[in-house]
Amino acid sequence: EADRMMEALDWIIWEMTDEETRSACGAGYKAFYRHDTGYPSNDFFKALDPRMEHFIEEKMDAPIKSIGETAGYLCESMARQLGLLAGTPVGTGIIDAHSSLPGCGIGEPGEMMIIVGTSSCHMVLSETEAGIPGVGGLVKDGIMPGYFGYEAGQCCVGDHFAWFVDNCVPESYAQEAREKGISVHQLLTDRLKDYKAGQSGLLALDWFNGVRSPLMDFNLNGMIMGMNL
C-alpha cells in the first residue's frame, strides 16, 4: 500500500526541501486539479472504487505551488550532498515538455510550441480560459504564472516510430544501417526525404495508442493500409 502518491517532480522537490508541496503543473495536467475548485470530489473517486473515496486527503493533499513560485528552501542534508548553501530557494517542479516553453523564450500568448518525443505536445499560453473540444489540458499557472496553459497533441509519436523500426523493417535495412554506421531511423529518413506525400501508396492512421486530439478516445486503434508483397 502506498503511503503517498505524487509525480516525480514533486518527490524531488520534497527531497530537496524536506517540505511536501505539489506543482500546479503536475496536479493540473495529471491529476485533474483546478485552480478554482481543487481536485475532483470524494464522490468522483468513490465512483471509481469505494476504497478511493478519501484518496486526495489520504494520499495527495499538500499545498499547491504555481510555476515560478518558491516551493521551499534547500534542507541541510541535501545541501551537503549538492555542495550548496542550506536555505537556497528551490523552485516549483514542472513537467519536462511544459518546461520547454519558458526554456525557449515563450512567455506570453501568441506562439504555439510543439514538443515531440514519445508523444507530441502542442502548447500555447492564453490570458483567458475556454473549454475547447479536443484540447485535453488546461491549467492556470501550469506553464507560466498568470496564464492558462493549453495542451493538445498525440499520445503516440516517438514510441510509434520505435515500434515500426523494431517490428516492420527488414533485416536488409538494419544491415545497411550498420554498414553505414547510422541508425535505422536515420536510414529511413534518408530514403524518404525525396518522397512526396502519398507517393508510396501507403496510408497510416497513427492511433496506435488511441487518439488524444481531437477525439480524446484512447480505445481507438491505428492502422496501415496499402501494403503489398
Short names for language-model regions:
Residues 26:
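Dinucleotide-binding Rossmann-like beta1-alpha1 core, especially the glycine-rich loop
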Residues 1-22, 30-55, 68-229:
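Active-site core segments that coordinate phosphate-bearing ligands/cofactors
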Residues 58-59:
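Long, well-ordered, tryptophan-enriched scaffold segments
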